[in-house]
């Protein structure tokens, strides 16, 4: 058997052999990330150092005093040095002020700007060239300032451009115009010097604009702070004056309280400044109802021949409660009226007129529509029979039993075609769970108006055991629907403009006002639009006036969170889980004459080291429900 040739056989070189003279590249000492980190930190340190140099130079120039010792004056031995950096600062400031005048401050501004750029991880390109430009710019600004001198003994007033600025201005003026101190030369030099310094500092136009905006914003904040301080002092002064007037015999006028009920906790004080600690409030939408939730399920009648669709008459006085809002049977609430408060009568609401109740159901027309609907479905290849018809105030439900083998998705996909063929605006098609029928909802030619009085006067609203019962309207069968808000963690009402959100909110509010007194239910209403909830201003159920300021709304919501936490703590003291159990426990203790106490540890016995417990009485009051409404 032949052996494979070895890769080293013969004089041939291996494929991986390195050519002669090739150098091996060594890996870098620092990785790219480490190098970038070191460069960034070095740039920040350089920027900090330049900023410190510029700041020190600015302080040296700012604390300049002509009486300090300098190289051109010999002061007394015990002279006081005013410069903050001592003798060195005095000599340096004297040299710069005497040479450049006010322009010397620009020498301190340039390194400060460079340091600011480096601290922001921005490079300063061509630093040597920019340094030369900075010197030239300072000299030209000194020329401009030299033409503004006065006859004062102060060198900054007599020679604001320093000796260098005066010499340059006079020399250039004599060279161009034959006379010293020409103002045109000084003006041109000042403009050119400003442009040169603009380039020397290394700032772009965008950065200059940003710095100007930040400066303006800082000045604006200082102005607002000053105004706030002045208004605070003014308010304190006015309050002190009012207090003094009351003490000297003025009439003591009591301001109305935000909370009108005596058995409730203190209402939130809506200050302009929100608290620091706040809680987040999570809103969860109620589950979207299915078609089956509003369809009345009746026993199916078997028939071998084609059955005439059964027309179910809409409900008259009978009503039903919504499945999701129906509470289990419980003890009736003790709805004792508050002192001086009476529940509003139904006479305040509009009586349901005959024209609004709708005309009597025309069963012949409904059967005709059922036959027409079967014909439309047959045109699209769907066979089936309409078993029942449920007319309602807004829509009419047709229960279609399709022929065996018909897919539900095929019928659901024909919704738009059914609407076109039936001359309807829209059609809703869905499967009724648990039954072999498909529900087809067609809008009525005339919509029935549902009035609140009809809902509140119904048996279900009066007899259903609920804590915060809401009248929501009618279902597709014409039966009233109520729900208990206490069973919902939150209730979110959403919809487009004109869809009835405001009507729904007002209906819910009135449902609570017609059922519960202020000592059982309190409201916090937030209406930044100042349109919908302002009509409830002044009702005794309000914990606070209707909140229209968004800042005060934040305070009100934070107060609500704190009140919720306090209630949880009080419930834990009594060992109950909800407000109803808490109030029932208090009523039971009050009826039995029992004093509610809590066993707490107050310390340890010094002799035995065992804990010492005491029974502390609990001063607890019944809690009302608090409903927060945000529009």
Curated annotation (Swiss-Prot):
ATP binds at residues 498-503. It is a multi-pass membrane protein. It is found in: Cell inner membrane. GO terms for cellular component: plasma membrane. Residues 1-27, 243-277 are annotated as: Disordered. Its main location: membrane. Residues 478-631 form the FtsK domain. GO terms for biological process: cell division; chromosome segregation. Residues 206-631 are cytoplasmic. Keywords: ATP-binding, Cell cycle, Cell division, Cell inner membrane, Cell membrane, Chromosome partition, DNA-binding, Membrane, Nucleotide-binding, Transmembrane, Transmembrane helix. GO terms for molecular function: ATP binding; DNA binding. The chain crosses the membrane at residues 44-64, 95-115, 131-151, 185-205. Consists of an N-terminal domain, which is sufficient for the localization to the septal ring and is required for cell division, followed by a linker domain, and a C-terminal domain, which forms the translocation motor involved in chromosome segregation. The C-terminal domain can be further subdivided into alpha, beta and gamma subdomains. The alpha and beta subdomains multimerise to produce a hexameric ring, contain the nucleotide binding motif and form the DNA pump. Essential cell division protein that coordinates cell division and chromosome segregation. The N-terminus is involved in assembly of the cell-division machinery. The C-terminus functions as a DNA motor that moves dsDNA in an ATP-dependent manner towards the dif recombination site, which is located within the replication terminus region. Translocation stops specifically at Xer-dif sites, where FtsK interacts with the Xer recombinase, allowing activation of chromosome unlinking by recombination. FtsK orienting polar sequences (KOPS) guide the direction of DNA translocation. Homohexamer. Forms a ring that surrounds DNA. Belongs to the FtsK/SpoIIIE/SftA family. This is DNA translocase FtsK. The lineage of its organism: Bacteria, Pseudomonadati, Pseudomonadota, Alphaproteobacteria, Rhodospirillales. The gene is ftsK.
């Amino acid at each position: 058997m032949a052996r494979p040739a070895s890769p080293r056989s013969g004089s041939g070189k291996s494929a991986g052999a390195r050519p002669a003279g090739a150098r091996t590249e060594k890996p870098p000492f620092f990785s790219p990330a480490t190098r970038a980190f070191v460069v960034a930190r070095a740039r920040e340190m350089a920027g900090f150092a330049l900023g410190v140099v510029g700041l020190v130079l600015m302080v040296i120039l700012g604390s300049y005093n002509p009486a300090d010792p300098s190289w051109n004056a010999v002061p007394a031995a015990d002279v006081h040095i005013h410069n903050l950096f001592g003798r060195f600062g005095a000599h340096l400031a004297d040299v710069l002020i005497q040479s450049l005048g006010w322009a010397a401050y620009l020498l301190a501004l340039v390194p400060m700007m460079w340091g600011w750029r480096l601290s922001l991880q921005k490079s300063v390109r061509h630093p040597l060239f920019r340094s030369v430009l900075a010197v030239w710019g300072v000299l030209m600004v000194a020329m401009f300032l030299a033409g503004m001198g006065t006859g004062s003994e102060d060198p900054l007033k007599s020679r604001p451009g320093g000796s260098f600025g005066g010499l340059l201005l006079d020399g250039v003026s004599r060279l161009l115009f034959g006379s010293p101190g020409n103002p045109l030369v000084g003006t041109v030099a000042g403009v050119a010097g400003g442009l040169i310094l603009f380039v020397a500092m290394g700032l772009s136009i965008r950065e200059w604009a940003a710095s100007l905006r930040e400066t303006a914003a800082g000045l604006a904040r200082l102005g607002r702070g000053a105004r706030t301080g002045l208004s605070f002092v003014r308010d304190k002064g006015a309050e002190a004056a009012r207090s003094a007037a009351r003490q000297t015999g003025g009439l003591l006028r009591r301001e109305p309280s935000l909370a009108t009920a005596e058995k409730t906790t203190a209402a939130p004080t809506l200050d302009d400044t929100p608290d620091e600690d706040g809680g987040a409030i999570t809103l969860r939408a109620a589950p979207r109802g299915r078609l089956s939730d509003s369809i009345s399920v009746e026993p199916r009648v078997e028939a071998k021949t084609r059955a005439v669709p059964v027309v179910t008459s809409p409900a008259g006085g009978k009503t039903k409660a919504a499945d999701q809002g129906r509470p289990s049977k419980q003890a009736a609430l003790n709805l004792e009226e508050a002192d001086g408060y009476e529940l509003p009568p139904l006479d305040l609401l509009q009586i349901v007129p005959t024209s609004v109740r709708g005309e009597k159901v025309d069963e012949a027309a409904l059967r005709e529509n059922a036959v027409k609907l079967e014909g439309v479905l047959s045109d699209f290849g769907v066979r089936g029979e309409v078993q029942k018809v449920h007319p309602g105030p807004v829509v009419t439900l047709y229960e279609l039993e399709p022929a065996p083998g018909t897919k539900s998705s095929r019928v659901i996909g024909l919704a738009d075609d059914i609407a076109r063929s039936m001359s309807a605006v829209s059609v809703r098609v869905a499967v009724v769970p648990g039954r072999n029928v498909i529900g087809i909802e067609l809008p009525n030619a005339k919509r029935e108006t549902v009035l609140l009085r009809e809902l509140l006067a119904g048996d279900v609203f009066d007899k259903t055991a609920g804590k915060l019962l809401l009248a929501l309207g009618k279902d597709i069968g014409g039966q009233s629907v109520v729900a208990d808000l206490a069973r919902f963690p939150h209730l979110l009402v959403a919809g487009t403009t004109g869809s009835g959100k405001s009507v729904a909110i007002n209906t819910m509010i009135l449902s609570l006002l017609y059922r519960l007194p202020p000592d059982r239910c309190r409201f916090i209403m937030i209406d930044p639009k100042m349109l919908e909830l302002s009509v409830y201003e002044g009702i005794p159920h309000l914990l606070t006036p209707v909140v229209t300021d968004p800042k005060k709304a934040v305070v009100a919501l934070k107060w609500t969170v704190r009140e919720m936490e306090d209630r949880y703590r009080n419930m834990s003291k009594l060992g109950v889980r909800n407000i109803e159990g808490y109030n029932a426990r208090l009523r039971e203790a009050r009826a039995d004459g029992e004093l509610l106490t809590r066993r707490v540890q107050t310390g340890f016995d010094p002799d035995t080291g065992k804990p010492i417990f005491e029974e502390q009485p609990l001063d607890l009051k019944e809690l009302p429900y608090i409903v927060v409404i945000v529009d």
